[in-house]
Amino acid sequence: MDEFSFPFQPYDIQLNLMREIRQCIEQRKIGIFESPTGTGKSLSVLCSTMTWLEAEELRISTDLSTRLGEVHTKITECDKITTADNWETAVREKMRAQDVETEILEQIQSRERLQSRIDQARRGMVEVSRKRKAPARDTDQFLEPQDEAAPSEEYNNDEKSEKQRDSDFFDDVDEEEEKPLKCLKIFYASRTHSQLEQLAEELAKTRFQPRIVTCASRGTLCVNEEVKKLKLNHLINEKCMELRKNGMSEKEKVQKLEKGTTKKTKTCATSCEFYNSTQIEDVVNGVLSNKLKSTLEVSKQGKLSNGCPYFATRKSVPQCQLVLLPYQVLLHDGTRKAWGIELKDNVIVLDEAHNVLNTISSLYSAEISTKSLTLALRLIREYNAHYKLKLLAHNLLYMKQLESLTSKMLIFLNSQSKEDVMTMAQLARNLNILEINLFKLAEYMEKTDLCKKFHGFYMRLQKEEIKKENEKPKLTGIQKLMAAKEAEPEPEAEPLPPPKPVPSPLFSLKSFIDALTNKCEDGRIIVEKSATEAKFRFMLLNPADRLSEVVTSARATILVGGTMEPAQLLVETLSRGSIGADSIRRFSCCHVIDDSQLLAVTVERTVDGKPFQLTYQTRGADTTLRSLATSIQALIPHIPNGVVIFVPSYDFLFNFQKKMKEFGILKRIEEKKAVFTESRQPTSDVWDRFSRAAKTSKGAILFAVVGGKMSEGINFCDELGRAVIVIGLPYPNKTSVELRERMKFLDTQMPNGGNLLYESLCMHAVNQAIGRAIRHRRDYAAVYLFDDRYAKESTRRKLSTWIGDRTQVKLGFGEIIRKTRSFFEANSKK
């Protein structure tokens, strides 16, 4: 067994990667690591981080014992000093030593308490304090149902927030225990839940058995059918909060049993049966004892034991050593706090991190339309009118500010005749809201659960309107007889379906207000106009600060991906903050394949000898498209099985295929291979049909778009991707408002920053597309880069190292054909 307990004999590149990761963690740095798909990246990261975790736990334990012994020795030495000259000094030193002793003992006791809790979990024990704290806001609700939409008291003394309420609910330890149980951990974040599940499967291949939990949304983990049927996450979240609020506390259950009450109240009937602390603790025990390692297992156990899997997962996080979580839980400040994620002294791994800056920008974006603002304004006004006698002065101030802000936003949007871009300061001046403190307004909405109250008020108004529509006027006895006599028999009307759940517009409004609390220079407000409505859209221009908040909080951060290059923008972004350049490590792996398994060439001239460069000016020209189509036709017969051709955009793709058809070239290509085209529709079966055809002796071609769904996440291994052809350099559209603003912002932050972003977006997309092929050690493929700009050294340096170092340039088309033929003949004999 090697130094990292790798489950197989590791390749040199895997050992190098694991050593680099371990060193990065030990030195408390930020690492940017590129490891091509097919090189065992996930296993390498897991084995290196788990090896460090084991060693660090042992080091901490040994260090505490050693330090405690040294302190005891120091105290004993101080006690032996009796001379008058040294006595005062000895007393001071002894007091300092005793303070250190207390600190060490607290750490040792905390570790012992944690181990005791794990032992309890393994025995399946659930310790419930006799003095269990009941959720504060549930205490009186069971006995006297309240108006859930009613305004709160002065919000500084308001009811407990959802997080506080859940904390009380989970407070199963004695009040004397001040510090929560927690341990050293690895936070491993990836884009999707399926990728996290794959990581758990990879871990199962190793000898490591850390306490592991996978964070997921309520939509993924909820087992309450009444809630799950709502489908949409925001509706699921709202329903979950509503049912938990309606549930009675443990104290109330005891009171009811003592009174012998059997009648179910309305509140009790609409609570969640799975929100039960004892049953939730059962599920937590399963996680901490390593019996439940996946979201599927946790969900099954939760349903079986009537314990909520979502809250069991949340409660398990502090005591788990490996926490798998989606990007949004780690990278979004509010979500991270809601989950109780503590980064201090822990290690972060961000998988597929090439797009981390765009991901953060997306997580902090917000928008609101005239339709939502109109409905929100109506709700706020009706709410204020309905509760005007209950609103305290402080609450009334904020509610009037909210009404004023909403009204001014709506008036401004309706008055706009064209699209516009503005800073947050400009928006405040345009709306004339300089007197409104948006920070305090957002805080008020958060602490009073205002969105939730409005949702209850909104749903109640909807029900009342439907009820009014269904009500018939009351008739006297004679009127009923006359009406029955005059009326012709009618078929019995079908009952009206229940109203579809609609989210309250206050959630969108609050998200937008939250966005406005970012630094003025860090964001832009875009006003969008369409034929039917207008909207405000907030765009975060500076995700660097948000990323810095995360990485500087942790002990070390590992940014890893199959295509991290070009990484210069990421490095510059991190360096602009409080992170010094010397704190960043970079490492790029070679591929596990041999040079003989990859043919990578730039196609600078087409088959007719003409220079090829696909630019905005040339991409629609018949001469350009004919030369390109003829070259593809000449190349295809020499490539077996599947060929994937990536083009810059859907518009180019459809025009190119139309022209190939006009030229008669498409028909000749189809005689050699079946041709398929990526659809804009997400439900298309093109992939399945291409996969079947590619494995035949004739083979198949798939035309796809760089940046489309086929260029990221799809596995073109073996026969599915014997060749990848990339047409042109897929630069993003510079007329895009978002891109233009981001480039302008980066130009103010660093020299040539906008162009660096422009180049990075293009080359990341190219590297992602190329990375779809060659997915394992014995795979092989050819890569053709159609554009003479790929021959430039500056462009090739932005390719992933394993591609750029192997790319051949300055070849004639005839030589490319000969190399292609030789390449596939040699590999077919292996």
Curated annotation (Swiss-Prot):
Write out the annotated subcellular location: Nucleus
Q: Which intervals of this chain are the motif DEAH box?
A: 351-354
Binding residue positions for [4Fe-4S] cluster: C222, C240, C272, C308
Residues that bind ATP: S35, P36, T37, G38, T39, G40, K41, S42
The record's section on Gene3D superfamilies has:
P-loop containing nucleotide triphosphate hydrolases
Task: Please tell me one Gene Ontology term that the record gives under cellular component.
Answer: nucleus
GO molecular function term, any single one: DNA binding
UniProt key word Iron: yes
What does the UniProt cofactor note say? Binds 1 [4Fe-4S] cluster.
**Is the Iron keyword given for this protein?**
yes
What are the recorded Gene Ontology BP terms?
DNA repair; establishment of sister chromatid cohesion; positive regulation of cell population proliferation
Q: Which cofactor does it need?
A: [4Fe-4S] cluster
Write down the species: Caenorhabditis elegans
Q: Where is this region: Disordered?
A: 124-173
What name has this protein been given in UniProt? ATP-dependent DNA helicase chl-1
Phenotypic consequence of gene deletion: Uncoordinated and sterile with cell proliferation defects in germ and somatic cells. Hermaphrodite gonads have fewer cells with 13% of homozygotes having only one gonad arm. Most hermaphrodite mutants contain sperm but only 20% contain oocytes that develop as far as diakinesis and those that develop exhibit abnormal karyotypes. Mutant adults contain significantly fewer D neurons and seam cells than wild type. No poly-guanine tract deletions but double mutants of chl-1 and dog-1 display increased deletion frequency when compared to dog-1 mutants.
Instruction: Specify the Helicase ATP-binding domain's residue ranges.
Output: 1-403
